[in-house]
């Protein structure tokens, strides 16, 4: 079996977390992590355009096979939810243009896959990302670490789906 390049995305309006890993057999390795940031003083349409254009550059540079994105699960602030929803829209558009399938995960699913516990702390998840990917330090900012965690979750979930499918 060949390798699988997974793009993890922690969607946001101000900061989009990006994490890319490669799965080859039983080995999962770190490829890249970073963020796409938009200044608060830019109008909404320019912020969304920047997210879209920068995200397309990531897709073209790293050619992921699949994308794992955090679901918009629960937010306390409606304004924040609207901005994140708009950002998700342009991210989905870019992924659709490149024919990259998207898999969505709730935050507690990501936590369970990295810690075995759906209410693990952010710090615990970040430490596990560092350890599992053999990184010298926790990826910064938090959004990038979260994106790597989402990618890791998908790697485990897709492996489980393949094993289940092979048994059928």
From Swiss-Prot:
One Pfam family matching this protein = RuvC
Q: Which GO terms describe its biological process?
A: DNA recombination; DNA repair
PROSITE patterns, from UniProt? RUVC (PS01321)
- Cofactor(s) the record lists: Mg(2+)
Reactions that this protein is recorded to catalyse: Endonucleolytic cleavage at a junction such as a reciprocal single-stranded crossover between two homologous DNA duplexes (Holliday junction)
What positions does the entry give for Mg(2+) 2 binding? Answer: 70
Q: Which residues bind Mg(2+) 1?
A: 10, 143
Where does this one sit in the cell? Cytoplasm
Q: Which GO terms describe its molecular function?
A: crossover junction DNA endonuclease activity; DNA binding; magnesium ion binding
- Look up keyword rRNA-binding and say if it applies: no
Give the main localization category.
cytoplasm
Active site positions: 10, 70, 143
Q: What is its EC number?
A: 3.1.21.10
- What note does UniProt attach to the cofactor annotation? Binds 2 Mg(2+) ion per subunit.
Gene Ontology cellular component annotations, sorted alphabetically: cytoplasm; Holliday junction resolvase complex
Q: Say which domain of life the source belongs to.
A: Bacteria
Q: Which UniProt keywords apply?
A: Cytoplasm, DNA damage, DNA recombination, DNA repair, DNA-binding, Endonuclease, Hydrolase, Magnesium, Metal-binding, Nuclease
Function per UniProt = The RuvA-RuvB-RuvC complex processes Holliday junction (HJ) DNA during genetic recombination and DNA repair. Endonuclease that resolves HJ intermediates. Cleaves cruciform DNA by making single-stranded nicks across the HJ at symmetrical positions within the homologous arms, yielding a 5'-phosphate and a 3'-hydroxyl group; requires a central core of homology in the junction. The consensus cleavage sequence is 5'-(A/T)TT(C/G)-3'. Cleavage occurs on the 3'-side of the TT dinucleotide at the point of strand exchange.
Question: Into which family does the record put it?
Answer: Belongs to the RuvC family.
Under the subunit heading, UniProt states: Homodimer which binds Holliday junction (HJ) DNA. The HJ becomes 2-fold symmetrical on binding to RuvC with unstacked arms; it has a different conformation from HJ DNA in complex with RuvA. In the full resolvosome a probable DNA-RuvA(4)-RuvB(12)-RuvC(2) complex forms which resolves the HJ.
Q: What is this protein called?
A: Crossover junction endodeoxyribonuclease RuvC
């Amino acid at each position: 079996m060949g390798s699988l390049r997974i793009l993890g995305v922690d969607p946001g309006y101000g900061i989009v977390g990006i994490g890319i890993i490669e799965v080859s057999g039983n080995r999962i390795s770190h490829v890249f992590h970073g963020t796409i940031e938009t200044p608060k003083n830019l109008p909404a349409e320019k912020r969304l355009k920047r997210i879209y254009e920068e995200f397309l550059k990531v897709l073209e540079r790293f050619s992921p096979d699949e994308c794992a994105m955090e679901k918009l699960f629960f937010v306390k602030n409606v304004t924040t939810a609207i901005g994140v929803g708009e950002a998700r829209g342009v991210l989905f558009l870019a992924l659709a243009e490149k024919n990259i399938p998207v898999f969505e995960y709730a935050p507690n699913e990501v936590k369970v896959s990295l810690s075995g516990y759906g209410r693990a702390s952010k710090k615990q998840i970040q430490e596990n990302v560092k350890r599992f990917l053999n990184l010298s330090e926790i990826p910064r900012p938090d959004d990038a670490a979260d994106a790597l965690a989402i990618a890791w979750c998908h790697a485990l979930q897709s492996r489980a789906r393949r094993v289940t499918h092979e048994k059928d």
